[in-house]
């Protein structure tokens, strides 16, 4: 999340050191500690969620920010062990480590409901040119590209006899791929729709205040005011108005009447749609939902968030 591309060298250094370990236990622990460091520094922000309410949940924060990286790091440790089991030759096993680590990142994204956050490939997401690689080979295969780039400097400066040939073989296809990404972005074309306007409303309401019922009317008035601001100067353009996730205290279907009143105030144009986040209750279950509201106050679509990512 820091968008500092040179930091990827840190992964390469860790993988390079693991490559020369002989004991499977040491290899697993080294891979685990590398993964723990990666996920700890990248997922530190999860702890901030425990400060949203003044309850006992804050004491669980250390457990969350330590336990989650610890579990995710098992994938990295296991990948390193599998790579070493396939090839005991320390000179070449680093390439196997890269392949298996990329494979285990795919498994991490799908096993146990999946948690694909903070893959090494996400480093490319902070640059408009580098992220184009995703369109060619996808985010999972891009893990191989990022990990290979991270170890190239260490291969080049090592005592490995064929280091120049290996470095060149690895670098050429990556360079071609990156060049194609630059060309793709440089030759991009945009689809324009001058008849439709998207309005994103962010009232900047603190989470701990959002759930106070007595403040709901004030929060709603703020959302409505921001939604209709400059409406008269928009020449009756068709609009899509987007409110935040869990926009206000309340849930559907209990708040259908309230939603109808909101649509009367905001959706004057029949082709305008309000998209808002709202809780939905059904058979004693609570869903974090995306609600589409038309100008008549009718709910035309509902999408329930069933997975974290």
Located regions from the model:
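Membrane-embedded alpha-helical bundles of multi-pass enzymes
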Residues: 1-187
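Soluble catalytic regions of membrane-associated enzymes that act on cell-envelope
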Residues: 182-309
